[in-house]
């Protein structure tokens, strides 16, 4: 993509929007087990924030921000999605039974988590990897 160098307002706005969308996507990812949201919606927002940077700058700038190979990210997501339900077997429970646990935060109250967060993380990685692989393959052909 040939981008003009005088897109200063677009580039500045894209950086601000990038961080806002990432924070909102992260909050939806964490809230997904009890309220609407989760890995799919969070993954779409993460990918859309990277698409905003790609549109405002170019693919090389987006690769500097996220140097991951998105095809590998799809594989990581699938490993999390497969390993989470299988892990319940190793804990002596039925397939896909979620286990609850608390993460102690020394000064603050402990955070209550379930293993569904790991499954949602796998969905998030798979969605981001898929969307960005499609966007990059379309963008590199131009």
From Swiss-Prot:
An annotated Gene Ontology molecular function: antiporter activity
The lineage's top-level taxon is Bacteria
Name where it's found: Cell membrane
Q: How does it sit in the membrane?
A: Multi-pass membrane protein
**Keyword annotations for this protein?**
Antiport, Cell membrane, Hydrogen ion transport, Ion transport, Membrane, Sodium, Sodium transport, Transmembrane, Transmembrane helix, Transport
Report the main location listed first in the record.
membrane
Task: Name the Gene Ontology biological process terms.
Answer: proton transmembrane transport; sodium ion transport
Q: Name one GO cellular component term.
A: plasma membrane
Relate the assembly described in the record: May form a heterooligomeric complex that consists of seven subunits: mnhA1, mnhB1, mnhC1, mnhD1, mnhE1, mnhF1 and mnhG1.
Instruction: Tell me its family.
Output: Belongs to the CPA3 antiporters (TC 2.A.63) subunit B family.
Name this protein carries in UniProt = Na(+)/H(+) antiporter subunit B1
List the source organism: Staphylococcus aureus (strain bovine RF122 / ET3-1)
